[in-house]
Structures are given as C-alpha cells and as structure tokens.
C-alpha cells in the first residue's frame, strides 16, 4: 500500500513539474535613459537602473542605445537594490548576456558609475 502511494505521489509531482510554466520578467518599454517598464505576466514595475548616472546631453543617444540593447519582450533578471519614490532601483541583467546593462552602459561611455 505504501509503494502505491509513493508511485502516485511521484506521478503527481512529475505532472505538476512538467505542466507548470515559469514566466520571466520582460521589457515592456524603455521610458527614459535610466527608467524601464518591466512586466512579469502578472504585474508591471517601473524600474530605475542602479548605479547609472546619465548626462542630460547624452539622453537621446542613451535612449536609442538602450532600446537596441533591450528591445521589447527581452527576458531579464532583476537584482533589486532598493526603491526611491515608489520606483524600484535594480540591476537589470538580460538572460542572453548575464552582464548587467549598467556595466554595458558605462563601457559604452554613455553613463558614469555612481555607486
């Protein structure tokens, strides 16, 4: 009888593991050179890039660069660092590169590190 329940339990666990989907956060919109709208199929978040300070004269160039790096529906990991005025401050790491977008920003010369 105990083996029967064990087999049933294994079948149920396998079924739920196979059928469950994991939804990653994804880029919905690049709002400005340091602010993104990110969604996870359930909620949306306004996210400010952590540790990035963008010069106002590079705003337009920075937005265009960021849109190329993070097109709509790009899957990302978030590493929150805090919040300011209800806006999440976080490191944003695209799945395909595993490098924080702020590091790329700084390497391109479009931002300075403020951390």
Please state what every model-predicted region is.
Residues 2-115:
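Small beta-barrel nucleic-acid-binding modules, primarily SNase/OB-fold domains
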């Amino acid at each position: 009888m105990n083996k029967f329940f064990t087999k049933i339990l294994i079948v149920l666990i396998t079924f739920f593991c196979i059928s469950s989907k994991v939804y990653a956060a994804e880029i919905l919109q690049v709002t400005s050179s340091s602010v993104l709208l990110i969604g996870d199929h359930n909620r949306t978040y306004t996210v400010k890039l952590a540790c990035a300070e963008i010069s106002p004269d590079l705003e337009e160039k920075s937005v265009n660069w960021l849109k190329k790096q993070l097109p709509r529906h790009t899957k990302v990991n978030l590493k929150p660092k805090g919040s300011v005025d209800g806006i999440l401050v976080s490191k944003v790491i695209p799945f395909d590169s595993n490098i924080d977008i702020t590091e790329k920003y700084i390497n391109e010369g479009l931002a300075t590190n403020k951390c």
